[in-house]
């Protein structure tokens, strides 16, 4: 067995390619930063803060810019004796209701040992406890709710919190809410009253294009990678792959980081395009497998139905076209099939996980409908399914059909 030894031939500071790294300067977001600073200006002026809503795909800089500007804001308010600023940040990814968010905020504000139970209180009682904690802090309070779309349509807190002072629930505390969402449709699903308050100032973060991603990578490489350790075309390839997929800086950085790790493990002297291609395949496989862990049996069967249609070159296709395929797979797995509406819900979940893409068709005589297809490589999807479903015969048949049609 070999010994653990340091590998330092490629990376100078690999952490600079990680999600937690905060660069000294945010690249390619000058317009968004300027607009964001204008929205935060009332804090410095001593007025009640704006409620701000940010939306855009994962990895386009929403959270990074927020952290960057709020750090700067806290530094700058130190020059003013009449401003007392507190910032509370909460990631809502695992929280699916206003009640859960309110409990987490209360417990974030209370000292260790003083937390409240996550169940057992009426919702308004929890809200009241939250107002008491906010009033105890006083001054200006910015509450950042990242991935706020996780709470779905149970959005009462998003209505109550921005209006707390106007409704007499707060006296001295001036609260502003910053909501960050990866879901473009979340805003439209909010109660109109919530839209009026939470979306006082809206900032959209568009996907990065390949040129912007290459510039971001170049700035990080200066910190993260040793001189001469990236072959010509590597950064351009990372940028092009990420731009073609989602426009995510996180994806581009992950490709470079993993490509560097693959190069080091193979004792290469520099990162080459082949390492990036291998990194892409590995990340795509991990993405599908991660999504699989969140799926129920019916979610997996719904996905296998789409994979089967893809093997036959029959995608994109509608829910009703997938339903017979799904029912057949349920029969093979001795599982009771759900109704067509429930299948539609599982397909929507797969879309949210980034495993499927959906194209809206507005020409239907009975209203709009979606056509679904894989948003991950066919090979990655079928391999992941073979690990989680005991349908060897059916999956082998799908593979054979795909091979006949040169799919994957």
From Swiss-Prot:
Example of a GO biological process term: DNA replication
GO MF annotation list: ATP binding; ATP hydrolysis activity
Superkingdom to which the source organism belongs: Archaea
Keywords linked to the UniProt accession: ATP-binding, DNA replication, Nucleotide-binding, Plasmid
Residues forming coiled coils: none
Residue numbers binding ATP: 60-64, 208, 220
NCBIfam families assigned to the protein according to its UniProt record, in alphabetical order: orc1/cdc6 family replication initiation protein (TIGR02928)
Family to which the UniProt record says this protein belongs: Belongs to the CDC6/cdc18 family.
Function: Involved in regulation of DNA replication.
This protein's name: ORC1-type DNA replication protein 15
UniProt organism field: Haloarcula marismortui (strain ATCC 43049 / DSM 3752 / JCM 8966 / VKM B-1809) (Halobacterium marismortui)
């Amino acid at each position: 067995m070999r010994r653990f030894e340091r590998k330092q031939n490629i990376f100078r500071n690999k952490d600079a390619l990680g999600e937690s790294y905060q660069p000294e300067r945010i690249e390619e977001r000058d317009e968004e930063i300027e607009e964001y600073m204008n929205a935060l200006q009332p804090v410095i002026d001593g007025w009640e803060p704006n409620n701000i809503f940010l939306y855009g795909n994962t990895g386009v800089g929403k959270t990074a810019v927020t952290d960057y500007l709020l750090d700067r804001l806290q530094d700058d308010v130190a020059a003013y004796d009449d401003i007392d600023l507190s910032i509370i940040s909460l990631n809502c990814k695992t929280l699916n209701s206003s009640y859960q968010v309110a409990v987490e905020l209360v417990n974030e504000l209370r000292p260790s040992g003083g937390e409240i139970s996550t169940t057992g209180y009426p919702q308004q009682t929890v809200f009241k406890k939250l107002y008491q904690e906010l009033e105890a802090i006083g001054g200006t309070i910015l509450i950042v709710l990242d991935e706020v779309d996780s709470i779905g349509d149970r959005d009462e807190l998003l209505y109550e919190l921005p209006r707390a002072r106007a409704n007499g629930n707060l006296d001295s505390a001036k609260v502003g809410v910053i909501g960050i969402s990866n879901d473009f449709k979340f805003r439209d699903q909010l109660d109109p009253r919530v839209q009026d308050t939470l979306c006082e100032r809206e900032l959209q973060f568009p996907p990065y294009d390949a040129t912007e991603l290459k510039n971001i990578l170049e700035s990080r490489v200066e910190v993260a990678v040793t001189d001469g350790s990236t072959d010509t075309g590597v950064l351009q390839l990372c940028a092009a792959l990420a731009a073609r997929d989602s426009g995510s800086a996180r994806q581009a950085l992950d490709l470079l980081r993993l490509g560097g790790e693959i190069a080091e493990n193979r004792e290469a002297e520099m990162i080459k395009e082949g390492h990036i291609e291998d990194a892409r395949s590995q990340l795509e496989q991990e993405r599908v497998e991660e999504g699989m862990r969140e799926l129920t049996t019916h979610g997996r069967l719904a996905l296998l139905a789409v994979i089967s249609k893809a093997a036959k070159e029959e995608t994109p296709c509608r829910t009703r076209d997938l339903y017979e395929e799904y029912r057949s797979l349920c029969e093979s797995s001795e599982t009771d099939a759900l109704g067509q509406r429930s299948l539609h819900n599982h397909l929507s979940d797969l879309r949210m996980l980034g495993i499927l893409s959906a194209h809206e068709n507005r020409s239907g005589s009975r209203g709009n409908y979606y056509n679904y297809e894989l948003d991950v490589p066919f090979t990655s999807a079928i391999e992941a399914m073979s690990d989680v479903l005991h349908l060897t015969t059916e999956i082998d048949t799908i593979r054979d059909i795909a091979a006949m049609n040169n799919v994957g």
